[in-house]
Each structure stands twice: as structure tokens, then as C-alpha cells.
Amino acid sequence: MLQQFCLWKWLAVGIAVATILASSLAQNDEDCKLARTGPPATIVPIDEESRNGTILVDNMLIKGTAAGPDPTIELSLKDNVDYWVILDPISQRLYLNSTGRVLDRDPPMSIQSIVVQVQCVNKKVGTIINHEVRIVVRDRNDNSPQFQQQRYYVAVNELTPVGTTIFTGFSGNNGATDIDDGPNGQIEYVIQYNPNDKTSNRTFDIPLTLSGAVVLRERLNYEEKTRYFVIVQANDRAQNLHERRTSTTTLTVDVLDGDDLGPMFLPCVLVNNTRDCRPLTYQASLPELTDPVHVNPISVTPPIQAIDQDRNIQPPSDRPGILYSILVGTPEDYPQYFHMNLTTAELTLLKPINRDLHQKFDLVIKAEQDNGHPLPAFANLHIEVLDENNQKPYFTKSTYEGFILESSPVGTTISDSRNLTSPLQITVLDNDVEETKDPQLHLFLNDYNTFFTVTQSGITRYLTLLQPVDREAQQLYTFSMIASDGVQESTPVTVNIVVIDANDNSPTFSNISYNVKIYTDMGPGEGVIKLTAVDADEGPNGQIVYEILAGDQGDFIINDRTGLIAIAPGVVLSVGRSYALTVKASDSAPPAQRRSSITTVYIEVLPPNNQSPPRFPQLMYSLEVSEAMRTGAILLNLQAFDREGDPIRYLIENGDPQQVFNLSQSSGLLALGKPLDRESTDRYILIVTASDGRPDGTSTATVNIVVTDVNDNGPVFDMFLPKNLSVQEEEANAFVGQVRATDPDAGVNGQVHYSLANFKNLFRITSNGSIYTAVKLNREVRDYYELIVEATDGAVDPRRSTLTLAIKVLDIDDNSPVFTNASYSVLVPENLPPGTVFLQIEAKDVDLGSNVTYRIRTQEALEYFALNKYTGELSLLKSLDYESFSDTDATFTFLVEAFDSKGTMPPGLATVTVRVKDMNDYSPVFSKTLYRGMVAPDAVKGTVITTVSAEDQDPPGTPASRVRYKVDVVQFPYSASIFDVEENSGRVVTRVNLNEEPSTVFKLVVIAYDDGDPVKFNTTTVEIAVLQPSVIPRFTQDEYRPPPVSESAPKGTVVTVVMAAALNQTIVYSIVSGNEEDVFAINNRTGVISVKKPLDYERVTSYELRVQADSLQVVRSNLRVPSKSNTAKVFIEVKDENDHAPVFTKKMYIGGVSEDAKMFSSVLKVKADDKDTGNYSAMQYRLIIPPIKDGKEGFVIEAYTGLIKTAMLFKNMRRSYFKFQVIATDDYGKGLSSKADVLVSVVNQLDMQVIVSNVPPTLVEQNKDQLIGILERYVQDQIPGATVVVESIGARRFGDGYSEEDYTKSDLMVYAIDPQTNRAIMRNELFKFLDGKLLDINKEFQPYLGQGGRILEIRTPDVVANVKKQAQAVGYTEGALLALAVIIILCCMPAILIVMVSYRQRQAECAKTARIQMALPAGKPASTAANNLYEELGDSTILFLLYHFQQSRGKKSVLEEGDRQRVISSFASRAIEAHKQSNINGSLNNNLPKSSSNITFLSDENPLTTQNPLYVEGVTQSPAAAGLLRKRSDALDTLSPMQLVLRDASLGGSHRAWTVPAHVTKRHAPGSLSRPVIMDPVQWQQERLKAENEGTENQHSRVDISSPLFQKISGPTLTVKEKARQFEQQALQEMKQVKSPDVKSTRSPTHSICLQERDNTLEQSPKSVFASPCLRSSPLSSPTPCEVVEPEPSAVPSVIITHHDYPEELSPPPTRKPTPPSFRIKKPVCQSFLAPQTKGEVTENIPDPPKTPPPPPPLLPPPPPSPPLLPPHPPTLPLASVPSSSSLPSTQHLSPAKHSKSPAKQPAVPPPAAVPEPPPRRELKGILKNIQNLAAIEKSVANMYSQIDKNHVLPKHISKLKPVATPELPTPEAAAEHNQQNGNLSCVVEELEKRFPSQSTAL
């Protein structure tokens, strides 16, 4: 046993080991394999230029472990070229190895992929597996495009058409290249804006951006611009626009001059701002009867010359010559007298002209080009024929006297009077010339010709001033004047010119100042000194007036005429006083021209005897002397005064070492002795002495003389600066050199300014003398400049000096070689041997040191031609054969280019056209060697006799193959004189009218020749026989005019019959002309002409046939004999038939009509054309249109004009459209018809745009169709087939509200209609279509709007703009309303404050009234007590109820009071019973669930129970929210599902029972309010009948319907107190409405808190069921039944109010059974409303109550007293007793389905808790002592008040409603119980009356 156990144990161990080994071996086999699926190779992408260490493969996913103590695999890299990859074997990760290098996919590295092998060695098994890793290098856009050349060049002729490709140099490898790959390497070319050449980007374009072909976009004009610099940008096509790289180059486009302008006559005076010349008239004059030899060529002024405006056509040999001619002239026989040389324009006289016949010639001369493209120019030539010069010129006067003001400027005309108002007219005539014409005389002055000159043209001449005159120098100029006509001279006349004085001289004193000594013994009036001033003028200008200006101090006076200064009267002189009088001398000229000067008189008062030394008037004298002062000029009077009068001697003691000044020793006058030079000495200080010869008789004075500067020195250039300068061409603002100049003068006279005297447009100089180039210089235009620099100082009359600089322009390689001809054309004869040189081309490079080489650029031409690269000789490589080419292509055209071997500029290009000349190989060959013909002896000129024909075997279309004919005049000259052959057709005709003898035979030799080179020819002979007249038939009529033939005439219809007669001859008829289309046929024997082919009047209206009659003998010989008699004309008229239907000009007419269009407004005009004529083309139009509105057609059409008009109004029909058909019938509606479609779309100004142009509306109206066509084309570019319609054309409207009009501009209002949508295109879209193309539209509008006419803007119509403006602005009415609202709010603020204060007062009264104590008998217990009623209602509610109760008691009738007492008693009993259930041990149990009891106002029909939303938890319908619904809904007439019958219509309402539930438990809400129930009226009645049959057994299972009256409304939910306060507010509002005298009918119950206006009794019921349908707030919806929830059996008993005390006569029997509810919409009166709804699902969710309290309710004043509505003592109705809860009969309820959910069970009542001792309170008296928990009773009473009819106003007429099912009568026990409760209620009321009398709480 043990052995077996060991055996089995070892066997198990072996099996385990084997299993482990097997699994290990299997695992080893999987190592080195990939752990992933998919392809074996690993492919990863990587961007080029990735950084070193970038992870290539995160994990190779190779099975096995390469790390650890026992690795299973070993990894390594193989084929790792350049070691780009690094392997981490542990993590199986691959890295990029780019250390010290960059992974670049682009050349030169060009690494596009890297392939390595990851080798895996299985260390367990030993197998090796290689895993391929392929790394794809992705391209990055890291290279910019690179152009192969820095610049590109192309030359374009200005006549190149727009759209021509002018440059393809960017194609291939010549453009830009990008070494990137894919889109990064693809190149696009675009033209960029060049700020230095602003028109280049719009002149050229690259439409195909990938090809780079430059296309001409705008027309070139060599005269405006000769070169363009086009910036071409090359960019790659990277996907990300921001990553695209670009580079630019410049394409230089030279515009070549083309022959687009004609000649122009010189001289050309341009019209302002144009290139047009003003009309030019050449003048010439010829003496009469002059021999042409003496005057030829005629002298013309100016010489006639015209030049071609295209002055630079290359090569010069292509420039056209100019041909001159006289186009037209008057008189018409001018060609007899004049001839103009065709090339030189020399005018020659052909014969003498008699002036009696012709006095003048007015000719129009023409100059045109000689190249077949004339482009003529015109000028006028006026030639005067002069009378024979045998009369002397003569003046009309013998003496002329003129006047001129001496101050007149040069050029003034001499006047004929002293007032200088009119010029002096010198009239000179010559009797050889008409008096009205200029005699063209020359006038000469024999003297004073440097002062005066005379005009040299016209009959009247004028003398003008050449230089100023001075009257003071010479007052009268007298000279003689002679007139000469070149042959004879006139008699001299005398001319006296009087110079009128001008006030040009000022009065001058002899001295600058005067010194006078006077003595104290001199008396008043005694003279002191007499001053004299001199004025050279005459008259008032020379009369001098003196006056003392200052310094006299009132002691001296002066005579204004004599200048005598005397002592003033009454003056006593004092010794030692001195005076300095300033005296002015003025002339008597007018004040504006008056001149004056002043002097100073120094007066010193001395005693009668004086022994003192001489004294100078001043110790210091200061004066300024100009350095230009003349020598000898008196500078200063230094006269001293000596009292004794001793002689004084004056000397200069110091300060004048060079003796520049002279001082008179005796007079003291200081004069200038030598010239002054400020630049050497600018100041002198002289010490002057005066001595009388006595000791101490010397005094001194100092004279300070400042030498002022004059501009006597010019600027001097620095000659050490270089004057030979150089500058490189093609550089703007390049520095050229520097100059410097100095001026020794002072101030502005020494300030130096530089300027250039020449080449100012090429160079500029700065203020410091630096010279720069102003523009780029072109050495090829000019390589050397002598620039003159001028330096000026700053003086008024500046001095100048100049310096000449030599500037050499240095060359750069900036020009390509230019061929002497832009194109070469050569004619090469065929069959020339190879090597023949047939053309030499030449190109020149204006750059220095250039060597030009040539080559053929077109590869195809290299097969035939060779070009010597140095000489430019073109030669043949092989012989050319003309016949080897096609008929039209025997021409080679290829490009040759010239290179500058050392330069970098693009090559010059030229076009060579080689035309192979066909050599004439064959001669023409006639078809016959002999031709015969016959002719009548009287044949007229041009009669065709026969036709010769020859052919040439040369290639067709070549000149060598063209055959022409002529007559050999050498052989048979007479025959050649009467017969001829037509050159091209070969027809032999008579040259003259024949008159030959019959039977004569003539021979004529005809030559056929070609136009080949050389010309080859051949001859043939023609024999012409003249027939006898008798054998020639003669027609009976020369013309036949048959009746018109209908165009529908069938074939064979006879047209007419022609007849001819001949002697013994059989006549054969034929049609010889006019029947080219073979329309008619003639019977050759009978002469009957018939129709052969159908006629078409629309194509040919008439035929003119020429028929010929010949004898049968002649016909048989295949000849014809035309003569005068054997031919006749047949005129056949074709009669039109109505064989063409009308054709409309369009298949569909599209138009529009405005919404505000009036009746019969024009919409559009249709037109149909008919090829027929007459009435057959007269149209009648009609419409096929279905009725549009009220059975009327919307449009009508004028029957004969096609004008469609409106027949209805289209108001508010925008975006509508109408489609109909128009039918056109010709022959005024009796003929053929055709139809077209018409589309009319209704638009308004919202669809329109206004096109404002600067031309008048009339011009727009005239060109409306053309302008609309242009607009339509641009709109159709966006929307094919669109039509543009004109709405109106008027004056431009502008200003505020577009109320102003400008008739110089126009508004064109248009809109466009889309044929796809049949509606107007949106206004914004139309604006985009037109505004984006405004420039192009203006270009096309230009021919129609005139010069300068254009579109100014495109805007929206003024109506749309005004609507927008009005929508943005608040009107005055709105503003006034807003202001009124603000005022009302401000006025309401005091009222709000009063309400708040009153509310506080009411709260205080509420607290007092709440302490009312009342004792009531015990009621019957109920199943569930009401809980927390006091807290739920709040003190405000109690206050309101008491207030309302007291007001009602005091103002209502006895009947109303009794009803109210019964209600209160019954309600109070129920409240106490409910209170006892919630009272445990005298305390209020707050943990019990809230009551679900109901208070129901019951009508005499089935009670309908509803919940009171005031106490329902979670209901969001607050009075505020209900107010929202009231705004959105209408009140319903009834909510009951029964139709009631009322006796009086004034009684409103449905008399339904409405139950106000106290509260619904939270857990009841989901089941009662969220479950939808759908019930229609039929289902409702069935359910109702079913509920009636259930009886009392189902009483406990009936459901209590939760009120679904309110839908879920977003907003805050309210607490119970807040709801109570809002309920109070609502009750006050309803009371006010009910008591208002306006209310005519009772309100229907539309809200759970709305009270029925009827009298009710209280009845206790265990439960009541709500059976009213739930309605939504929509006023248009129907009632929808809601789900009914069955309450628990222990539901709170309800207090039921039933009718009582109503007379039976007021309750009529029912007239019909109740029906489902009908609704009547009326004004809402309740807080919330229910709206009808057809059928729907109602789901309500009651949210949680809000946390924010509502605002306090407004306080209302007490309602006014209402009169009683019933008699004071009405009979009472029998009262039903209230049964007990166990025996209460079933009332009429509507109980829906039994599946309604039941509420959850109520929680258990907790055990009583210890109640703390209440605070002390006032001792109660009487019955109130026995009432426990008085507070709870007070709350019950308050609840009672809230449910009483607050608006207890009985209606005037009450109709008692009959219930559907009579309710069971109450039992006697129930009645007794009810009576007992009524009695108790009376006691309660009496006790309340005693304890709390009624009080008013008026606000």
C-alpha cells in the first residue's frame, strides 16, 4: 500500500515537471516574435529636422525579456546606415540620432526614409528574427521658392490685345523652384502691388497661377508709359496658409511703340489736360497776277509740316512715311491754281490768280501714313490773294500825341489823353489791301526806339513803353514814324509823347540839421532861421508845406509856406536853454501819395555878451554810414556856437589815421574823403575839436561812425574741392560731390544759398552744398553732364557766382541687346542651295564693352536654318520646296536672341519670318485652241459673246496659279478695238456699240497670263461672226410686268408668256440672267414662264429676269447672239402670304410689380415679330391667366401694343409671383398664333437698390435699355437668367429724410428677379453683385453717360432707410408715455407709504382681536383633526375676517344676517370638533399630519369638490402667479361638466359646488397631481352615472380629487402664511368687484377661491369628491379631465353648505338634462383662471414652497353699503338635517376610476408630552372659562371667516337649479342634530355680540 502511494506520488511530480517544461519550451518558442498583429514591418513617420533623441518607436512589442538576470532575448540593430537610429534593448525603444547633423529630406541630403533591422536573438532556443523598421521622413516647408534669375525682361508692343500672354519665362526651369516635396514644393505665381509702380499689378495678371504665364490685363499705351516694373511673387502651396513661404522677383516690361497714332501737324498746341492739338490754320498770301515762277514754292506761315506721333517705332525702317494732299477747299476750282507735293507738302502755284475772281482760298490739307493704315490728320490753309502793290501805306493822322505816367512800368500802352483812360490808336492803311484786313505793314521809329515800340500787326497799332521814363529828366519825347509794306513807304508822321508827373520825389532839405543861436534880447515874431526844401516834382507834387513836429515847447512858430521859424508871441527867452526842433517838409499830393522829409534845428539861447569857448550842441554824435556812400558826401554838421560870435576853427584830433573823413575848418561839415570798406574797417570813433583861438577856447565832441554793410561781395567757391565727379547709373539719391562757397558780407548779405542752374530734374543740391542724383541716370541716354552750381547770398538783390562741375556717368550692365528691328521678314525663293545666306540680323547693346552673340531660340527652326553667332547671318541648312508645304503655310516664324557675353541682363529677342517664295513652274493652258462666237450687228457695249478659260498647274492660291486675261492688241488691232476680254472671268464682250456689216468675221487673240515670277502666259484665238438681222428674233415687248405671284404658288404655276418673232426661224427662249437660284423655268418653244421652285416673299420680294430669244440654228451651234431686240426684261413681283407665325422676342418675359402699384399700372411690354408684311405682321395680344383674386384676373394687356398692366392691388403680397401666358396672333387676331410665358413677381422697396449717378435723369432715361443690359449681365454672372427691372428714374434725393432733390444727378431704382425662385433677389445680394463690380460697370456705362458720367454710389431706397431710422428712435408719443409713467410712479410712492403704515396698525389690531374667547358646545368627533391652522393663516387673516364680518353685520338685511349666523354656527361646530382631535391633554399636537378637510359650497346639484390651493403644500399658484394667468386667460362661464338652465340671463355662474380643501399632505401630491387622465364629455357622463349607481357602499372608497386647477408655473412658491395674506388680498378685490354697481351678473367659479354668490347651509359629510375637470390656461383649449386620487378612509369630514331659505318660485324645474360643459369667455375676475382645452394630457408637479415672503397685501377701504337684493322676510326652504358619519346618505358625486392611488398611512400619534406652564394671562369670564386651548378655537374661527361669503350679496333674481338626481332626504336624527347645532350657533353669535361689539377698522 505504501509503495503504491509513493508510486502515485512520484508519478504526479513527473507530470507536473513535464507540464512546466512543456510550457517553458512553448514560451521560449514565442520569444522574439511580435506581440502585435498586423504587417511585420514597423512603419513610423517623422518630420525632417526633428531634434536629436526624438522617439521613433516607443516600443517594438517584441516578446521576451532583454533585461534582468536571466534575459530571454537579445536585441541589436542591423543595416543602420549612417547610424541614424539608436536602440534601447531594455525598453525596446528606438531614438533618432542626429548629433552634429540635421535630418534633411531636401537636397543635398535627400533622406526620404530610413530602413533598419531590429535583430532579435532567442537566447533559449537560439533562433534569430529580424524585424524591419521603416522610418518615413516627412517633408516640412523649410525652403522658400528661389527664382533662377534676379530679374526678368520682356518687351511688348503697345498694340498687343488685352488677354494676350506676354511672358512665359517662368515655365520650366526658368522660373522659381522649391526643393520641398509635395504641396510644399509646388509653386504659384501672383503679381504683387508695387508702390514704385502703382499700375503694374492692374495692367498685368497671372490667371493661371501654376503656369506663371503673364497675361496683359489692360491696354498699353506707349505715349503714357514705356516701362513697367512688375513684382512677381512665387509662393509654395503649403496646406497651412500661414506657413507658406514666398520670394519675389521683378519682371521688367518694356512697352514698344506701335502704330496707333496718326500724324499731327506742327506746331501743336495741346488742349488743356489732353493730348489733342488745337485746330491749326496755316497762312499764306500771294499777289494777284503773279507769275508762278516768282512765288513757287509758296511761303506758308508756319511751314506745313506733320510728324508721326508714334516716334519710336522699331526698327526705324518700319516707321511710316507721311503723305500730304489737299482734301477739299473753296472755291471749288482751287485745283486749277494750287498743287501740294505728296511727300514734302510744298505748295506751288499753277497759274496766276485774278483777284477780281478770287480774293482768298480756304483749303483743308490732309496728312496720312503711307503704310495702308492712314490715320489722317487735318489742318486749314488760308491763302490771301493780295492786290497789286501800287499804293503807299498811309496814316490816318499826320500827328499823334500821347501821354504816359512817369512811374508806369515797362509794357504800358501809351494813352491818348491825360486821364490815361484809353490807349493811343495809330491807324495805318494800304489801299492795296481791303480796309477790313490787316495790311501787314512794318512801322519804324526814327528816334527813341529804346524807349518806345509799336505793335507790328493789325490795322490799328499801339505804342508801348520799353523802359521807364523820368519826367524830371525829360518831359517830352518827339519822334517820327514810317510805315512800309516792303516795297513802298508812307509819309512820316510826328509823334509827341508827354510824360505826366508822378510824385516820385520827396522834399529835400539842404542840410540834415541846422544849428542856430539866439539871444535873450530877441523879441516875439523875430525870425530865427528860414528853412528851404526842394522838390523836383511839379504841381501839387512839388508844392512844399512846413510844420514843426516836436521840440519847440511852444516857444517857436513856423510859416508853412516860407519855412521861416520865428519866436512865438509872448515868449521870454532864458539864457542857457536849448531847443531841438523837428521840422517836416511835405508836398501837397493826395494823402495816399504824399511824400515828406524831416530835419532838425538846434537852437541855443545866449546872453547878449559871452566870453565862453565854442560849444558843440552834443558831446556825442552817432551815425551809420553805408560803405557804398559816395566820396564827398556830407555826413554831419558839427558846427559849434560861440556866444561872442568869434570865428571857430574845427579839427579832427584823433580816430582817423587814414584820413578817410574831411572836416571843414570853418563850417564844421564832416564829409567823406575816401571810399569806405566795411570788410576792412567797420567802425570809426573821431575826436573833433572846435576853437575860437582864445586860451581855453577849445571844446571837443566825439563822433561814432558805424560803417553799414552793402552787398558788395559775391559768394566765392572753394576751388580746392574736386570739380571732376562721377556717379554710377541706375542709382537714385546717389552722392555725387560737394561744393562750398563763402561770402565776407555781414548778415543776410553773407548767407550763401546753393542752387542748380541746369539739370534740375536729374540732380539736387542740399543747403550744405552736397550734390545727389534726383533720379536714376541712364548712361546710355547721356554719359556726361556739365553741371552748373550757382551760389547766391541772401540780399534783396543778391549777388551770384557759379561753378561748373564735370560729372561722368559710370556704366553698369543694365541693358539687354536690342535688335535693330523687332521683327524681320524675308522672302526666300524655293529651291535655293544649302548654305545660302538670305538675311543678316543685328543687335546692339548700349552698355560699354559688350559683345553680342546670336542664336536661334525656336528649336523647330534649327532643322532648316543656321545663325552665325558672331555676324548674325542667317543661312539655309537645306533647300526649301514650296510645294512641300500646305496650301496656306509656306512660312517659317521663329525667335532669335542676342546675348551680352559678359552681362547678366536677359537676351534681346526678335522675330524672323521666312516666307518661301513659290517659283512659277507652269504656264496657263486654254481649254480650246479656237473659240467661236456670234454677235448681232447692233450689239450694245458690254454684250457677252463667248467665254475663254485657261488653267495653271501651279499650286492653288499662289500668285503663280492665278490666271488673268487680256487682248493682244498687236495682232488684229481693229478687232482689239471693238472687242475686249474681262480680266478675271475671261468673257469676251463688245468694247463699243457695234455697227458692223452682217456676215463679217472677226479674229481676236486672247492672252492668259499668271502672276508668278517670272510671269508666264499662253494665247488662243476667238472667231466672232456678225449675223444677219433677219435671223435674230425680236420680242414684241421690251419689258413684261405680269401680276404678282403668290409666294405659296405651287410648282408649275404660270407667271407670264413672252413672245418673239423672226423670219423663217424657229425661236428658242431662254433665261439668261436674274434666275441664278433657278426659281423660274421657261418653255423654250412657247415662252411660258412658270414657277419651278417655291417662292418666299420674306427672302426675295421681286425678280428681274432677262430672257433671250434665239433661232434654233444658232442654238444648235451652241452659240448665242445677244442683241438689242432679242432680249427682254421680265419683272415678277412676289405676293406675300400669311405663312409665318409670330415669334416672341423672348421665351419668357420676367417683370415685377410693386406692392403699392395702382390699378392699371404698366408692368412690362411683350413683343412678337412676324416675317410677313402688312396685316400679316400686325399683332393682337391676349393673356391666358387663371383667376387670381375673387375670380378676377390680376393682369390685363393692351391688345395691340403688348403692354401688360395690373388689374388688381397687390398690397401685402411681397414675395408672391404670378405665371401666365401671353398669346400673339397676327392679322389683328385672325391669323397664326404663338405664345410665351410671363412671370411677374411682387416686390417692394425692400428688394430694391438705388443706383445714384452724376448725370441728369433724362440722359439715364434715354439710355435705359443699354444701362439695364449692362447691369443685367453682371447680375447674370452670379445668377444665370436673372432679369433686372427698372422701378423708377428720377432726380437724386439727398438730405435728411431724402427730402431734397438734385436734378443734375439721378436715382435709378432697380431690382432683379431670379427665374429659379420666381422672386426678387434679396436687396443685400443685389448690392454685392453690383457694388463689387462698380469700376467695371462704370467703364461700360461711360459711352452712354458721356464724358465724366459715372455711378456715384449704390444705396438702399429712402423708405427702407427711414424705416430703419424710425425703428432706432423713440418717437415723441413713446417719450411722453414714458414720462407719464415715471410721474405716476412718483405719485404712488406716498400711497404706498400710507398702506405700509396702515398694515402695521392692522397687525396690532389683529393681535388684540385674536384673544377673543368664545364657548361652543362640544361637537362630534371627527376622524382627523385640523392642525396648525393658526400658524397657517396668520393674524392678518383673522383681522380681515373679523373686519369683514363686522362690516357685513352692520350693513346687510335681516335675512342675510340669519343666513350668516347659521353658517357661522355650523362652521364653528366643525372647527371645534376638528380642534379636539388634535388636542391631547389640553395641548396642541403639532406632529400630526395636516388636515385634508374640505369646506364645500354646495349648490342644489351634485357637489363638486376641489382642493383649496391656499393650504395645499407645494402648490406654486400664488395670487401673484394667478394674476399672471389672469392676464393670459379668459374667465370661463362654468367649470362643471353639466349644462345648467337659468331662469334669468342676468344670473351668472353655474351654481356648482366648490370645495376649498384645508391642505393636502405632501405624500398625496405626486399621486394626485402628476398622473394624467384624459376624459371627453361622453366618458364623463358615463362615469357620473356609474358613480350614482354605486350608492353609499362605495362611500369610503371614493377618492378626494386633488386640485389640478393650477399648472406648474415657474416662480417662487409661498408659505402658508404668505398664501393666506395673498388670499386675503384677493378676497378684498373680489368683494370690491361684486359690490360694484357695474356688476350685472354673478361671476362663474373659475378659481378655487372664488366664492359662489348664493345662500348655502352647512352640512357635515365624511368625505367629498372633487369632480371638476382640470383646465389649462389657454383660452382656446377645451376642458381636460384630471386624475382623481382616492383619499384614505379616515379622511377629514367636510362641511357642506347647501341652499336654504329660497322661495320655491325662484327655483324652476329643469328643462333638460345636464350636458358636458360649455364654456363662455368673459372678463376674468378671479386670481387664476382655467382655460378650455379639447383633449389633452395634463401633468402637474407641485414645487416646494418659496423661501422669500410675498409683499404685504394692499389695504382697501370699507366697501360701500349694498341694498338688499331679496325681500326682508322671504320664506325659508326646508332644511335637511345633518346625518351622522355612519348614517349619512350618499350625496351626488362624480367618482372616476378606481385605480386611483391612495395616500400613505398617517403616522402614529406620539405619547403626550409634558407641557410647560403657560405664561399668566387675563382671567376669562363666563363660558369662556370652560374652553380648553382657546387659541386653537380662535384659529378655527379665523378659518371660518376666511371661508364665509365675503361678498355676500344676494342676486336680484335667483333661479333655483334642479339637480340631476334628487339627493336622499336626511334622517330625523340628522335633522335634529342639525337644529341643535343651529341653536348653539345662535348662542355663540349672541355671546360674541355681547363681548366684542362690531368695530370698524377703516384705513
From Swiss-Prot:
Top-rank taxon, per record = Eukaryota
List the stretches on the Cytoplasmic face of the membrane: 1398-1899
Assigned GO CC terms: plasma membrane; stereocilium
Q: Which UniProt keywords apply?
A: Calcium, Cell adhesion, Cell membrane, Disulfide bond, Membrane, Repeat, Signal, Transmembrane, Transmembrane helix
Q: Which Pfam families match?
A: Cadherin (PF00028), ECD (PF18432), PCDH15_12th (PF23206)
Q: In which tissues is it expressed?
A: In the utricle, localizes to the distal region of the kinocilium and near the tips of the stereocilia.
Stretches with biased composition (Low complexity)? 1774-1791
**Where is region (Disordered) located?**
1668-1687, 1700-1721, 1734-1820
Gene3D superfamilies per the record?
A: 2.60.40.3430, Cadherins
Q: Where is the composition biased (Pro residues)?
A: 1706-1717, 1743-1773, 1804-1814
- SMART domains, A to Z: CA
Where do transmembrane segments lie in this chain?
1377-1397
| Cross-referenced SUPFAM superfamilies | Cadherin-like (SSF49313)
Record's signal peptide: 1-26
Q: Name one GO molecular function term.
A: calcium ion binding
List GO BP terms, alphabetically.
cell adhesion; homophilic cell adhesion via plasma membrane adhesion molecules; inner ear development; sensory perception of sound
**Which cysteine pairs are covalently linked by disulfides here?**
32-120
- Coarse class of the protein's main subcellular location: membrane
Membrane topology, as annotated, equals: Single-pass type I membrane protein
What InterPro entries has UniProt attached to this entry?
Cadherin-domain_protein, Cadherin-like_dom, Cadherin-like_sf, Cadherin_CS, EC_dom, EC_dom_sf, PCDH15_12th_dom
Q: Can you say where in the cell this protein is located? A: Cell membrane
Domain Cadherin spans what residues? Answer: 38-147, 148-265, 278-395, 396-509, 510-616, 617-717, 719-819, 820-926, 927-1035, 1037-1144, 1145-1259
Q: Which PANTHER family match?
A: DESMOGLEIN FAMILY MEMBER, NEURAL-CADHERIN
Function per UniProt:
Calcium-dependent cell-adhesion protein. Required for inner ear neuroepithelial cell elaboration and cochlear function. Probably involved in the maintenance of normal retinal function.
Q: What is this protein called?
A: Protocadherin-15
Species source reads Gallus gallus
